[in-house]
Amino acid sequence: MKLNTLQLENYRNYDEVTLKCHPDVNILIGENAQGKTNLLESIYTLALAKSHRTSNDKELIRFNADYAKIEGELSYRHGTMPLTMFITKKGKQVKVNHLEQSRLTQYIGHLNVVLFAPEDLNIVKGSPQIRRRFIDMELGQISAVYLNDLAQYQRILKQKNNYLKQLQLGQKKDLTMLEVLNQQFAEYAMKVTDKRAHFIQELELLAKPIHAGITNDKEALSLNYLPSLKFDYAQNEAARLEEIMSILSDNMQREKERGISLFGPHRDDISFDVNGMDAQTYGSQGQQRTTALSIKLAEIELMNIEVGEYPILLLDDVLSELDDSRQTHLLSTIQHKVQTFVTTTSVDGIDHEIMNNAKLYRINQGEIIK
C-alpha cells in the first residue's frame, strides 16, 4: 500500500497543508520543533486512530482551533481509497471511503504502518507494558479478530477489578458473580494469549535471519513469549480453558485480598535473547538497537505475509543514527517495496542510495517547502 496524498487541517502546528507523497522515500528535513514529527505522527494516527505520543486526542488539535482533520488517499494493488479522521474536543470520527465507521475495529487495518523512533529501544530495555503495547499495536493492524478479543478482554478485566475491589472493601460478599466473571475472563484471556503466542512465533521466524545478517552471523536472536497464564498450548480448547479456570480458582482468595486481577494477558511480557542472554539485562546499547531494528524489519515482512500489502514505514529521527551495516539492511528491506517517510535535521550520514530514490521536503514552522 502507498499513501498518495496527505491533507492536514488544524493538526498540531499545521494550519492547512497537502503533501503529495513519493511512492518510495519521502525525507522531511528541518530544525527541531518545526513539525517534522507531527507530520509523521499524523500518518500513524490516521492508521491506528490514536497517537503514539499522547493518549489525549485534544492535544492533536491546533491551538485555538475547534477540530483537527487528517485525510489520506491510499492506493492498494486493486485500487484507491480515502481514509479520514476528524477530531474534536468531544471525540473522534473515522471514515473509510467516505463512510463513517461505528467501531474502531472496523477501521484499523486499512492503513498499516511500522514506526521506528529512538524510543523504540524501549521495546527491548523498557517495561513489560511497553512490550504489551507493541504487540497490541502491531497484531491489531493485521487481525481485526484480535482487536475485538482484546477489547472484550479489557472490558471484562475492568468489571472483574471493580468487583474485586468491592470484595476487598467488604461492599460485596457473594463470590458467585466473581466466578461468572472468571468464566468470561478465561475465555477471552485464552483467545488473546493464543494469538499473541502465534504472533511472537511468526515474528521470531522472520527476525532471526534479519538479525543474523546485520551481525554477520555473530549473534543469534530469539524471542520468548512470557504469558502470565501458563498452560499447555498442545491441548484442545476445552482443556486449556479448564486449566485457566483452575489457575483463577486457586488464586481467587489472593485476588480478593489484593482487590485486583493477578493473572492474565495484562501481565504478559516478552524477552529478547541475544546468544542466549537477555538483551534487556545484559545487552549493550548496540545489541539492543540491532534487536529493535530486526524486530521492526520483521514486522514489515510479517504484515506483507498476513495482509498481502507492505505497510508504510515511518522513521522518526533514527536513520542517521544507524551505522552503514544497519542502513544497508534497512535499504535492502524497503527498496522499491516499502513506502517510507523519514524525518531528519540533516541528510548527512544517510545512505546515498536512499537519497537517490527520495523526494525531499523542507519543514519550517508548520509549512512544507519543497
Swiss-Prot record:
<dbReference type="GO" id="GO:0005524">
    <property type="term" value="F:ATP binding"/>
</dbReference>
<dbReference type="GO" id="GO:0006302">
    <property type="term" value="P:double-strand break repair"/>
</dbReference>
<keyword id="KW-0238">DNA-binding</keyword>
<keyword id="KW-0742">SOS response</keyword>
<keyword id="KW-0227">DNA damage</keyword>
<keyword id="KW-0547">Nucleotide-binding</keyword>
<comment type="similarity">
    <text>Belongs to the RecF family.</text>
</comment>
<comment type="function">
    <text>The RecF protein is involved in DNA metabolism; it is required for DNA replication and normal SOS inducibility. RecF binds preferentially to single-stranded, linear DNA. It also seems to bind ATP.</text>
</comment>
<dbReference type="GO" id="GO:0009432">
    <property type="term" value="P:SOS response"/>
</dbReference>
<dbReference type="GO" id="GO:0000731">
    <property type="term" value="P:DNA synthesis involved in DNA repair"/>
</dbReference>
<dbReference type="Pfam" id="PF02463">
    <property type="entry name" value="SMC_N"/>
</dbReference>
<dbReference type="GO" id="GO:0005737">
    <property type="term" value="C:cytoplasm"/>
</dbReference>
<dbReference type="InterPro" id="IPR003395">
    <property type="entry name" value="RecF/RecN/SMC_N"/>
</dbReference>
<dbReference type="GO" id="GO:0006260">
    <property type="term" value="P:DNA replication"/>
</dbReference>
<dbReference type="InterPro" id="IPR042174">
    <property type="entry name" value="RecF_2"/>
</dbReference>
<feature type="binding site">
    <location>
        <begin position="30"/>
        <end position="37"/>
    </location>
    <ligand>
        <name>ATP</name>
    </ligand>
</feature>
<keyword id="KW-0235">DNA replication</keyword>
<dbReference type="InterPro" id="IPR027417">
    <property type="entry name" value="P-loop_NTPase"/>
</dbReference>
<keyword id="KW-0234">DNA repair</keyword>
<keyword id="KW-0067">ATP-binding</keyword>
<dbReference type="GO" id="GO:0003697">
    <property type="term" value="F:single-stranded DNA binding"/>
</dbReference>
<dbReference type="InterPro" id="IPR018078">
    <property type="entry name" value="DNA-binding_RecF_CS"/>
</dbReference>
<keyword id="KW-0963">Cytoplasm</keyword>
<protein>
    <recommendedName>
        <fullName>DNA replication and repair protein RecF</fullName>
    </recommendedName>
</protein>
<dbReference type="InterPro" id="IPR001238">
    <property type="entry name" value="DNA-binding_RecF"/>
</dbReference>
